[in-house]
Amino acid sequence: MATADLILKNGKIFSVKDDNTIIRGEAVIIKDGKIDNICGNDEALKYEGNNTEVIDCGGNTILPGLCDAHCHPSIAAAVYAGCDLFGIYIQENETPDEVIDKYLARLKDFVDSHPDNALIRGTGWVQGNFITDRKPARQDLDRICSDRPVILESFCQHSLWVNTKALEIAGIDKDTPDVYAGEIVRDEQGNPTGYFKEPEAMDLIKMNVPGYDFSVEEYKDAFLFYQSEFANKYGVTLVQDCMHSDNAREAYVQLAKEGKLTVRARGVYMLEPGAFGEQLPQFINRKGSDDVGKDFRIDTIKIFAEGMFVLKEPFTEEFISENGMPKGYRGTPYWNDEDLGKSIEDSMKAGFDVHIHAMGD
């Protein structure tokens, strides 16, 4: 019997066979970087040699790996190469102005240290800090940077906060029509405030400010950072990026082909209301063309059934009334029932899984 390179003993071991049968044991035998056996502690003694490393798991549970079925690793590009607004400590009693000042202080540090960036991008601010009439506005960002476009995405990717320069470059003003699935927040005169809610409104900025998206190389560097600093450290072995750009998708493909992924990744094709009749046949024809073995694959259609509500308090009838919404308000559906049902049915017939963003009724 060959000796093991590594033995994990005295654990509660759970694994799965190819036929989905659960395997239980007390020890894991590892040889040449692969699991050779899962067995009891007594049997594990047979695999010990002079050069075998033995780790006592102390009765802890050992799993083969965690799968994060809804995450956004590509956001790492905005953290890695942009202004990181995550991790700013906000106290419960702080006013919106005090919160904004904290965000602006972090932004100023980034702007001052990146004088050559033609575009300032970032992510991580939280809409739930602004449930009063005071909302993030372009004038706030103008105080820090007015000569370059500033585009800050919220932590959840459902809102944008931009400065006046970004609005000018995108050609957005009071005459810009409202969108159905989202909101261009406006002041009393109808001028855009620089606050955009939900993807359809956000795309007015993203699609019209040159250089908004990160490059393929920036995404590759960012995912390698995410992979080593987060996924590998916390036992995540598979991630599904549930909203990503074409550049991010290409970054995954290249990393997989280069053999640099230690985390399996899955992407999505985004199906939009009103356009699914043209989009879905394209996705069906493309299915499999982006796949790289088991390391990267796109076999999921993503649908936004509605938007997102970020609050510090429950979504009650009292809250609805206080915020001027009609009694019984349940949000705004992005799809009619017939189109939504057909898009799901046709996607599944084509062999796709369907991933639906839905937070309400």
Q: For the regions a protein language model found, what residue spans apply to each?
A:
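Divalent metal-binding segments
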Residues: 3-9, 14, 20-282, 299, ...
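Acidic (Asp/Glu)-rich catalytic clusters
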Residues: 255-259, 286-293
